[in-house]
């Protein structure tokens, strides 16, 4: 597996409240996490940093002992621990009250991508020239789309499009969403914050991944989001599948 990533403050924000981390292991396994913090003052930046650091520490300690078929429980537990870490900070420090963060995490091993997420940061799969969104936004407008009250096109312009319904750290417990997908050599998994997807349409994301060298693609994607307005922090994490050998689940 190969990894390329980039984060940018954008054109309209005073600080970057996004965070990310990724690891490439010797057996072909790899994982990555992207978080988009929220909260006044420094709360969003702190929340995303705590969540990312907690996930990193948990994966470093526990992933080597995860057997095939245990990936879902492992990743759900990781989000539960990260949620508690952010929540404990938010409720113990008055300056951090109300902070939280989205999170989208992918574990790639043995021909499968295991995905857990909370919020509207997304995972995509680029496969054979086509891009597909793997996650469903936990947001107010997504609920309106799902119920047929508005279209996806209307959702992109909705005044409440940034109102999320699930996030790490806003309550004592969380129920993240898990799914998994088969992956093949040559595929690209992309994790990103809404600073990218609010500025660049899915079709253009796929075209950029198809036409751009892997390690150049994060820069091209971020630049395109900046040219589109750069209204939020922008984070892109790419994981290129080079082999599907290793532990299968």
Question: Where do the protein language model's features map onto the residues?
Answer:
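PP2C/PPM-type serine/threonine phosphatase catalytic domain
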Residues: 1-249
